Amino acid sequence: MTVILDSNRVNSRSGVDSSLVIFLHGYGANGNDLLGLADQLSEHLPDTVFLAPDAPETCSVNPGGFQWFPIPWIDGSTEEESERGLLRATEDLQMFIKQSMEEEGLSEAETILIGFSQGTMMALHVGPRMVDSILGIIGFSGRILNPESLLEDCKSKPPTLLIHGDQDDVVPFSSLSTAESTLQE
């Protein structure tokens, strides 16, 4: 069953909507966590609508926040629970992206996903599996989930910018090179 994701919005500065940015927050946060970036970005992207959905599940280690899927080494969930959560979150996010584009009258070619940590994981999991390529993916401090399945399921290759600090103690810096090599195949 697909969950309709709650979302927050910043309208385009110009009032003319020609592109869409969807922010995907990290584990334990909510959509508002990244929405503040819209103020700075809208100066350079005045025709852009910014959306920031809350992930579909309440975070078990931070009940005030949300998670896209459970993370076993953080919350004690099983690998199976994590996989089921990822499948559900993928369906929910795909539906959110589709509905958002329809509501805004915009296409994949006018849509960018920007993620942080677990939000980057979702962007890299969903974006390349879309039949029509999105405008791009920008990811901070994330990784590719199941690189082998992405290679099998990849339908498009959106331009992707990945940024990752070498002192990250949550998502290893080595995840950046794995993502780079997977996305270039």
Predicted region positions:
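Conserved alpha/beta-hydrolase "acid-adjacent" motif
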Residues: 32, 169-175
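Catalytic histidine neighborhood in serine/cysteine hydrolases
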Residues: 159, 180-185
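A short beta-to-alpha transition loop/helix N-cap that caps and shapes the active-site region
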Residues: 57-63, 144-149, 170
